């Protein structure tokens, strides 16, 4: 008759401690990752090259100089940015009149087009808007977002508000990090100089998800990924995080 040896206590203890050891390793790695993220987040502003107050001054001055003229305003804004030697190396070298640099953006139910002036890990600066109007969800983001209105009007409201916030040309709409609103650009059009400061990569899925789940506009997806990567990687290579 075959006999069965009882499993040794040593083997049993080894088997029981193995999952515990794995959980300890995973937990330690998770704590370390969270600590790293918290440390980086505490110094994120040290990576910024833009001052949102200076951007507002550039935008509002351009609006005052060329009221209602989007082309002249865009030129004025870019001329001022490129005239600053601290900013010029990090600005898109192409002109906004180059149609290949523009792309549609479908996000949160809204649709507009954008021109990327700057993109890096902690900041982006774009022209964004539409001449025909749109409305949608702002998204809940890992960055502060400053919409400097150049032409037209933007309206927004947070859940619970009974009246809309109104942002005319020359004003700035600050969407604070982690907050969310519905926003609308009327049918007569609106263009904005949008500055985001915080962690940009986590925002990218919001800006790209509609292409994959709804519009299936793969050429636009490709252009968006290519130009964003070109600017981000290019800036990383010259020391802009």
From Swiss-Prot:
Compartments it resides in: Endoplasmic reticulum membrane
Enzyme class, one word?
Answer: isomerase
Gene Ontology terms, cellular component aspect? Answer: endoplasmic reticulum; endoplasmic reticulum membrane
Q: What is its EC number?
A: 5.-.-.-
Principal localization reads endoplasmic reticulum
Q: Which UniProt keywords apply?
A: Endoplasmic reticulum, Isomerase, Lipid biosynthesis, Lipid metabolism, Membrane, Steroid biosynthesis, Steroid metabolism, Sterol biosynthesis, Sterol metabolism, Transmembrane, Transmembrane helix
**Entry keyword annotation includes Transmembrane:** yes
Q: How does it sit in the membrane?
A: Single-pass membrane protein
What terms describe the molecular function in GO for this protein?
Answer: isomerase activity
Membrane spanning residue stretches: 23-43
Q: In which pathway does it act?
A: Steroid metabolism; ergosterol biosynthesis; ergosterol from zymosterol: step 2/5
InterPro entries on file = ERG2_sigma1_rcpt-like (IPR006716)
Q: Name one GO biological process term.
A: ergosterol biosynthetic process
Looking at the keywords, is NAD present? no
Which family does the similarity line name? Belongs to the ERG2 family.
Please identify the protein, giving its name as recorded.
C-8 sterol isomerase
What is the organism of origin for this protein?
A: Mycosarcoma maydis
Q: Which gene encodes it?
A: ERG2
